[in-house]
């Protein structure tokens, strides 16, 4: 079967976990893994699995006679900002797993269909990938005046990049809650949980809704969208049924629905408690396969 050719740029934890997922894809062939450290564990694992592994960076990749159809960038925002124009000039679609946010933000279960031909798409944040689908599930049934999410992740799964970009996490996720999730106002909070043993990623979503909103329809929509996410993130699940609260004197006449989530990682390269990272690589794979379907269809 013909497959779209892909390169993973970045041979760290995210890039290596993504490699395992792409190796299982029926329509993407991860042909190259690119890094800058010749002693990288990711490059070694890629080479062991027959993937062309180079520590000579993007310059080397783009100088090859054969080039990828899709690049998955798992480096840093700074590096991606430098590389993105080069990918675009060569007609290579980019899936950005960094905070660079140069292209439209995508959550596969919500708005992938709008961006299949985009030259560059951004995956927001792990908290966004987990919670925006739930805000969307509510907002497609009734107006959401305000949505607040709390993403709690195991401290060992949060590397220096995450810790240095907490403000960016909250700003970017809040924006996605509004622009993709459909809430009029969004707020995001991240908690790094130091518990031992490390816990799975847990997310709480609160949406303010009209007092007369159809609660049965909202519940059905939440389950429907959760199933859509589970199709590409098997460890994504509701921890309980949605909980509804009636209006209170301080709620402005609005009711509230609470949604409680858990994300268990697949354990491909990262440990299962790293659901916050796994959901990013799973979403990247789903987006890449959408790109590949478009690319392969156009080449027939």
From Swiss-Prot:
Its EC number is 1.2.1.10. The keyword Oxidoreductase applies. It holds the Pfam family AcetDehyd-dimer. Transmembrane segments: none annotated. The keyword Magnesium does not apply. SMART domains: Semialdhyde_dh. The active site is at residue 126. NAD(+) binds at residues 11-14, 157-165, 276. GO terms for molecular function: acetaldehyde dehydrogenase (acetylating) activity; NAD binding. GO terms for biological process: catabolic process. Keywords: Aromatic hydrocarbons catabolism, NAD, Oxidoreductase. It catalyses: acetaldehyde + NAD(+) + CoA = acetyl-CoA + NADH + H(+). InterPro entries: Acetaldehyde_dehydrogenase, Acetylaldehyde_DH_C, NAD(P)-bd_dom_sf, Semialdehyde_DH_NAD-bd. Belongs to the acetaldehyde dehydrogenase family. This is Acetaldehyde dehydrogenase 4. It comes from Rhodococcus jostii (strain RHA1).
